[in-house]
Each structure stands twice: as structure tokens, then as C-alpha cells.
Design a protein with these regions (language model features):
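Gly/Ser/Thr-rich loops at beta-strand to alpha-helix junctions
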Residues: 6-8, 51-60, 134-140, 356-359
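Short acidic, glycine/serine/threonine-rich loops at helix termini
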Residues: 11-15, 58-64, 68, 87-96, ...
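A conserved active-site cap/scaffold subdomain adjacent to cofactor or substrate pockets
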Residues: 159-266
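C-terminal non-catalytic interaction/assembly regions of soluble proteins
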Residues: 264-411
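Active-site glycine-rich loop that binds ribose-phosphate moieties when present
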Residues: 109-123
Length: 411
């Protein structure tokens, strides 16, 4: 399983597809597959991944090209379809769900989070590689389990357990200590060589989480429990396209070094709605950065920010951060920075950013920050200016009955 897609990466993929109809899938697809493709085909190891992103058919074509380049046979590839809701058919649902937040003139794409049934069907049809676009992360795990064990599609208990196994595997090494580590509080050994997780799932859907021997990281009950609660609002009702998973009475036990069992998860019938991510044109993000160091560095950085505010404040809503003083805890309007008394920081980087629908206007941010080299306070350096297109992402829900998922075989 290669789980590579997030809401942000899908939005970026939509931008790439707008520029090039053969782009829009994971840009690292070949880097991911090249070391393993021949071995997987030789040993009958199936590959399931959402690296199709905004363009799974193009991803399948790229895999075929990779096989040719490697001098191996062409794999039997299935492309899961049905997540693209960009047609006008679905606009009434989006209008009702999003109201004034939806700007149809700026709408670029919409993708629904599919479940695993088409993944399972494709594997049962002999697919060696299943390429998806937007499916739930856990569906990449549930699909192979449905196909392998032959569970009834309405076996909600087993599906609910499979959802949790997939949830534990999502985001890769989080369940082996990544994102868990906090030095001196939650120590994890050898994060530089962290091992990816393995889920050993039995016919009832219960699982054991472990990792490869002689790798860094940690699998213990603390890590597993933390990942079980990751992004979950209600432990008794984790909503996924495949089932509603209930972990409120689950049992998490240490079975040995880097080996944890999870049992007692329950499942209920899947929700009647599916989540959709609507992407619409968000204009252009212009930004610029410049550093100040030494005595009175903070005062000089604040002066530089004031210069840019005077020059652009009437045209743009500026986000201003003083990295080294206040940045992550700041706000777009700058209220907290304004309330923060000037200190004596000696290593400060000013960042200015703004969004505008007009590319030329957004570009002014980087130009004004660059001008601070000679038109601003003393000792500024290390200027970086950037300009990139943005997409706004709007989540909503549509009736499951309105969605049709399927797959097609590409050989």
C-alpha cells in the first residue's frame, strides 16, 4: 500500500492537471515504484495506491511507461473511477451544502471520498496494481481485506475493524513513532531509520501492528492508542465510507517488542453521506522574506514591516510574521503582533504574504520586500520572493446514493 494523498496534495494535483492534461498524479510515482515494481510482479505482490490523485488514468499510463523503461512486462492495472464530481450534475448538491461559499465561476474540481468496494472488485478481477484518485485512506487497506477474505459487503463488524486497521496504517510511520516523538517525554529510537508499519489482519478483522526488524521507530501501546485517536471526533463513531468504526471498547495490548494487538473494535453500517472536497480558484499568493541579525535586529525588522504596510496596505490584506519573535502563533490580521511589545531578538526573519485574484497585484509583495535590500533598514539580507497559484478547498457532504464508483482495467 502506498498512501500518498492529502487534501493539500490533491489541490496541488488539480493545479498541475490544469497546466498539463498528462499531469496531476503523484510527482514521485516513478521514484516510489521503480525500486519495487519488478519484484512485486515477480512475486505476485499486489500494489494499491491513491497516487493517481487528480489524474489516475495518466498515472496508469506512466506506470506502463515505467515498465517499458525497466524492461519488464506490462502489469494489469485497474483505475478506480467515480471520485471526480466536476460535472454540472453535482452542482445542485454543492449549492445546497455550501451556499454563498461556492463560486461556480471559480470552481476547478470536486472529488468525493470513495470507499473500498471498487478496489476489492478490481483485485478480484485480477488487477496487479490498483490506482485510485480520492478514496478514504483506510479504503486502501479495506479493499484488499475484502478481496482476500471474501467478507460479505454488509459485514459491518469486520468492515469496521478493517477501517481501523487502515486508519492505523494511514500516514505511514505515524504508528511506528513518527509524529509521536517528543524528546524527554515520548522518546523514539533512531527516527532517522524509522521502519514502516505492518498490519497483520486475521479473518475476523482484528490486527497486530508491527514493523520490520532492525529498523528505527517504536510500536507500543502509547503510539498505537495515539494513532487510533488521530483525527477522530467521536471514538464510538468514526465515520468512514466503508463503515462506522467504534473503538470505545477496543483492547490494545503489547504482545512483544514492537508488536501490539488491537481487538474489540466494532462496526456499524456505513454513513448515508460521503465527504466531498470542492476546489475553486483561490487567486495568487505573493510572499517575500528578508532577514535581520545582530543588535536591534527586531527593531529593524519591525521597521521593514511598517514600510511594506505603508506601501501595500491599501491594495492588499497583508499577513506579516516576524520569525524568531512571533509567527506560528500569529494571526492574519496582525493583531497579536501589534500587541506584542518590541523585544531585543537578534535573529529575525520578516515574512510578508498576501493573496489577490490579480497575479500582478500579488507579485508586488515580493517586489516590495526585495526593495528592502537598499530602501529599508540597515543590514537586511537573504531575500526570497515567491508567487504561486492557490486553490481554496471547501468540504461538504453529498448523498451516497448519488455516487457511482467503478473501475476499469488498463493493460
Amino acid at each position: 500500500i502506498f498512501e500518498t494523498l492529502a487534501e493539500r496534495t490533491l489541490a496541488l494535483a488539480q493545479l498541475e492537471r490544469r497546466k498539463d492534461p498528462e499531469a496531476g498524479f503523484d510527482p514521485w510515482l516513478e521514484d516510489i515504484l521503480e525500486p519495487v515494481l519488478e519484484k512485486c510482479l515477480r512475486h505476485g505482490v499486489k500494489i494499491v495506491s491513491n497516487f493517481g490523485a487528480a489524474n489516475p488514468r495518466a498515472a496508469a499510463r506512466r506506470i506502463q511507461s515505467l515498465a517499458v523503461r525497466l524492461g519488464i512486462r506490462s502489469p494489469r492495472i485497474a483505475v478506480v473511477t467515480g471520485d471526480d464530481l466536476s460535472s454540472d450534475t453535482y452542482l445542485p448538491f454543492f449549492r445546497e451544502a455550501l451556499g454563498d461559499a461556492l463560486d461556480e465561476a471559480r470552481m476547478v474540481a470536486a472529488n468525493v471520498y470513495l470507499g473500498s468496494d471498487s478496489v476489492a472488485d478490481a483485485l478480484l478481477d485480477g488487477a496487479e496494481i490498483v490506482v485510485t484518485g480520492r478514496v478514504s485512506d483506510s479504503a486502501l487497506c479495506v479493499g484488499p481485506l475484502l478481496a482476500h477474505f471474501g467478507w460479505a459487503r454488509d459485514d459491518w463488524t469486520r468492515r469496521g475493524r478493517a477501517v481501523m486497521a487502515g486508519h492505523l496504517l494511514e500516514c505511514g510511520v505515524q504508528v511506528t513513532g513518527g509524529y509521536f516523538a517528543d524528546p524527554g517525554v515520548k522518546d523514539v529510537p533512531n527516527l532517522f531509520d524509522i521502519g514502516y508499519p505492518i498490519a497483520e489482519v486475521d479473518a475476523d478483522g482484528n490486527c497486530v501492528i508491527t514493523k520490520a526488524d532492525n529498523t528505527g521507530g517504536l510500536v507500543d501501546t502509547r503510539v498505537v492508542r495515539e494513532q487510533m485517536l488521530y483525527e477522530i471526533d467521536d471514538p464510538s463513531a468514526y465515520l468512514a465510507p466503508d463503515a462506522i468504526s467504534d473503538i470505545s471498547n477496543s483492547v490494545v495490548e503489547q504482545m512483544g517488542p514492537d508488536c501490539v494487538s488491537v481487538s474489540g473494535v466494532e462496526g456499524r453500517e456505513w454513513p448515508g453521506t460521503l465527504k466531498v472536497l470542492v476546489c475553486q480558484d483561490g487567486g495568487w499568493l505573493g510572499e517575500g522574506e528578508i532577514s535581520y541579525a545582530g543588535p536591534r535586529a527586531e527593531a529593524r525588522a519591525r521597521m521593514a514591516a511598517d514600510i511594506v504596510k505603508h506601501r501595500l496596505g491599501g491594495k492588499l490584506d497583508l499577513r506579516i510574521d516576524l520569525i524568531g519573535v512571533l509567527s506560528i502563533h500569529g494571526d492574519d490580521a496582525g493583531r497579536r503582533l501589534a500587541r506584542t511589545p518590541q523585544g531585543s531578538a537578534r535573529d529575525v526573519r520578516l515574512r510578508v504574504a498576501a493573496v489577490h485574484q490579480d497575479q500582478k497585484v500579488a507579485e508586488l509583495v515580493g517586489r516590495e520586500v526585495t526593495a528592502l535590500y537598499t530602501c529599508g533598514p540597515a543590514g537586511g539580507g537573504g531575500v526570497r520572493a515567491g508567487l504561486r497559484q492557490r486553490l481554496d478547498t471547501l468540504p461538504c457532504y453529498v448523498p451516497r446514493s448519488a455516487i457511482q464508483s467503478n473501475y476499469e482495467i488498463i493493460e
